[in-house]
């Protein structure tokens, strides 16, 4: 279930990342397939493809096509494929390993069709532990990137004119400030 939840979170990070790019008037140029192909990492390619699909009908994206003076966005926006992609690679590793483990014989002793009974160490859970450790590291990186986008979105000096903490009447209302504080803990 943890792996399935991680897959859902990976996809959700792309949806929220695309929404952040839109809210911050970012450009999707960094997700161009040619950039991803130059790196040659499968997860990165797939991440960028998902972001391009999510932004396909974006009116904000269209506003960048002609004469946009900006060269590049903040790392938290333009480096999503470079962070989300390795998370997908780790997720695929964990899915494969855990899938094989779910289909494995882990009893001890093992009894074979010919009646032979052999004691071994297939019960040891190191493979699953390592897969989940890799997944935990990957998900931490995904969360860190998301927190950086949240921070950029709520900080008035960096959020392209959105109200501070996304609240009307900042000072009186905290908006999503506590959500951002929670994300840093």
Where would I find each of the regions flagged by the language model?
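Charged, low-complexity, helix-prone segments enriched in Lys/Glu/Asp/Gln
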Residues: 2, 6, 80-83, 87, ...
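Proteins with a high burden of low-complexity, intrinsically disordered sequence enriched in S/T/G/P/A and R
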Residues: 1, 26-30, 37, 79, ...
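Conserved amphipathic alpha-helical "coupling/scaffold" segments
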Residues: 2, 6-9, 16, 23-26
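C-terminal catalytic subdomain
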Residues: 126-185
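Short alpha-helical "patches" and their helix-cap loops
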Residues: 10-15, 32-36, 146-158
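Residues on a specific face of well-ordered alpha-helices
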Residues: 11, 15-18, 49, 160, ...
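Accessory "access/gating" subregions that flank catalytic or transport cores
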Residues: 21-144, 160
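Glycine-rich beta->alpha junctions and the first turn(s) of the following alpha-helix
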Residues: 1-11, 167-175
């Amino acid at each position: 279930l943890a792996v399935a939840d991680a897959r859902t979170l990976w996809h959700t990070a792309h949806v929220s990342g695309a929404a952040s790019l839109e809210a911050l008037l970012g450009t999707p140029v960094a997700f161009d397939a040619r950039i991803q192909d130059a790196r040659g990492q499968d997860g990165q390619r797939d991440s960028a493809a998902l972001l391009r699909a999510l932004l396909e009908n974006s009116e904000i994206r269209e506003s960048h096509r002609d004469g946009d003076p900006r060269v590049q966005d903040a790392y938290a926006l333009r480096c999503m494929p470079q962070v989300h992609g390795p998370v997908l690679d780790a997720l695929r590793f964990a899915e494969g390993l855990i899938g094989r483990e779910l289909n494995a014989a882990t009893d001890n002793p093992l009894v074979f069709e010919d009646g032979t009974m052999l004691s071994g160490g297939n019960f040891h859970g190191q493979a699953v532990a390592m897969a989940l450790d890799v997944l935990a590291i990957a998900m931490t990186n995904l969360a860190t990137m998301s927190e950086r986008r949240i921070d950029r979105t709520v900080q008035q000096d960096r959020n392209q004119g959105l109200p501070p903490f996304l609240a009307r009447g900042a000072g009186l209302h905290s908006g999503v400030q506590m959500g951002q504080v929670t994300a840093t803990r």
